[in-house]
């Protein structure tokens, strides 16, 4: 909603449907996007995305290109929000190719700090007026956005309980990391016991 500035009727691609990406899907839906294409190699992630507002889902950006081209009559996506576990130059290029004229590619996923993971044709970027933007914590302003998000949760417009695949005690935290790496969880949550 904030970094890609999604508007009603737009086409948004979300690449990587984990704890972050599932909420990019929900944000795109709330902002009124017409087409929300969720990309994830794992079927459980794609299913959750479809449940929470995605209109289409594919295992890779490449597989989405034909449908994306058809549904937008070649204009392509207005934005691509990249939320994979590990950002690679292939994923950045996939998002760059998926957006059309004036399209915005949002980089949320991370990699090693020194990793060179952006390799793009600059002339196409200029001629198509595409832009690439980094986003930290959804570019939110906690003072106003956290109460707003809580209100949207209370009214049922943002689903938070539904995205929790499993909860863990603090003692089970390593199991939680194993499940995260194995792709089992859309969102795993550690519950601190107070007794
Ligand atoms: N910018 C920020 O403010 C911010 C904040 C927190 C986390 N992060 C970063 O965001 C990223 C996502 O975090 P998360 O907690 O959602 O992780 P996660 O592991 O829950 O989700 C990542 C998802 O990406 C999918 N994926 C892996 N390779 C893919 C590919 N080639 N194409 C499409 N999908 C692919 C995985 O299957 C998984 O569903 C991480 O890199 C994390 O470090 C950024």
Region roles according to the model:
Residues 1-62, 66:
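Mid-domain Rossmann-like dinucleotide-binding core that forms the NAD(H)/NADP(H) cofactor-binding site
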Residues 3-8, 47-131:
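Glycine-rich cofactor phosphate-binding loops and adjacent beta1-alpha1 units
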Residues 13, 37, 104-106, 133:
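Structural detector of well-ordered beta-strand residues that form the stable sheet scaffold
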Residues 24, 45, 91, 121, ...:
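Hydrophobic alpha-helical segments typical of transmembrane helices
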Residues 42, 111, 138:
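Residues in the short beta-alpha loop(s) of Rossmann-like NAD(P)-binding domains
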Residues 57, 132-134, 163, 167:
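Conserved beta-strand scaffold positions in the cores of enzyme catalytic domains, especially
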Residues 63, 79, 93-97, 101, ...:
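C-terminal hydrophobic helical "lid"/dimerization subdomain
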